[in-house]
Regions:
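N-terminal glycine-rich phosphate/pyrophosphate-binding loops that anchor nucleotide-derived ligands
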Residues: 85
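Short conserved micro-motifs at the rims of enzyme active sites and ligand-binding pockets
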Residues: 51-54, 271-273
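N-terminal amphipathic alpha-helix/helix-capping segment at the start of soluble metabolic enzymes
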Residues: 1-44, 49, 92-100
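C-terminal helical cap(s) of enzyme catalytic domains, especially alpha/beta-barrels
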Residues: 267-285
Length: 285
């Protein structure tokens, strides 16, 4: 378990230690692991107030426990990256866990889960400048397109600007697109084949160049049709339960799919340990 005292000592008495750790971090020589793919652990959910894993609405609420689970995942062979907000990535920096890892900074966390302004997803975490300054390998943004919510256009514009700014610094711009609707007052992502095709084509066209754009997409039906919508490289996200592994395996056979970005289903597996869940996911690569 990470030592909370050590983290607090650095944060209260030596805050410059964070920048020093980022500068000293050994960067990966490639985005890809020895398996030729990307295997990224996603841990940016808490900043949106999304703490649920499985049936526990506050599963991710204990930060030291979450860090311990992330460390366990990052230590497994074949895991070569992590996605997080500044607070989590800086804890991992102080713990010395980010050497040789592909580090992706999460950017727009302003669309807090369950709020009236959820679709107007402001860039409240990393920006392109801070990602480049820290020496990280990319930035990730969530793009939810709700035809009935005027906040969508602000998010579209912000994501387009972020793609351009990341590309100008030659780092990955990871876009996670959805068509979304409010159902009984809550935002729900449309996971039909047609909706994902439309979302991907919109995301692929963001920014002044797509040279550094990657897409982060969920498993839906007819993934071959979905992935045929663009030539951009893609990473598969999410999924829960036993069926997820079979779905990931099938998706990884598609030519544009370059790996996995998985969070809660590996960090809080329904059965077994974090190591067991991660090793099984890595075996698919």
């Amino acid at each position: 378990m990470p030592d909370l005292g050590d983290l607090l000592e650095a944060r209260t008495r030596r805050p410059d230690a964070i920048a020093a750790a980022a500068a000293a971090r050994k960067r990966p020589t490639s985005l890809f692991g020895e398996h030729g793919k990307l295997m990224i652990i996603a841990a940016d959910h808490p900043a949106r107030g999304a703490l649920r894993a499985g049936a526990d609405p506050l599963a991710m609420a204990n930060r030291v426990e979450l860090l311990d689970r992330i460390r366990s995942a990052l230590a497994r062979p074949g895991v070569n990256g992590v996605l997080g907000t500044p607070d989590i990535l800086e804890d991992l920096l102080l713990l010395g866990e980010l050497d040789d890892k592909v580090v992706i900074g999460s950017m727009n966390r302003g669309g807090l889960a369950g709020t009236t302004f959820e679709i107007d997803d402001r860039f409240t975490a990393f920006d392109a400048h801070s990602i480049a300054l820290a020496g990280y390998e990319g930035g990730k943004m969530l793009l939810r397109i709700d035809p009935d919510d005027p906040g969508t256009v602000a998010t579209l514009e912000s994501c387009g600007n972020a793609v351009s700014q990341l590309a100008s610094r030659r780092v990955m711009a990871m876009v996670e697109p959805f068509i979304s609707h409010r159902v009984d007052g809550r935002v729900r992502n449309d996971l039909t084949t047609e909706a994902m095709i439309r979302a991907m084509t919109v995301a692929a066209g963001l920014g002044t160049t797509s040279a550094y754009t990657w897409l982060k997409v969920p498993i839906v039906s007819e993934m071959d049709r979905v992935m045929a919508a663009t030539t951009l490289p893609a990473l598969i996200l999410g999924g829960e339960g036993e069926a997820a592994y079979a779905e990931w395996r099938k998706a990884l056979e598609l030519p544009t799919v370059q790996g996995l970005v998985i969070g809660r289903s590996l960090l809080y597996p329904a059965q077994g340990t974090v190591a067991d869940a991660v090793d099984r996911a890595v075996s698919l690569l």
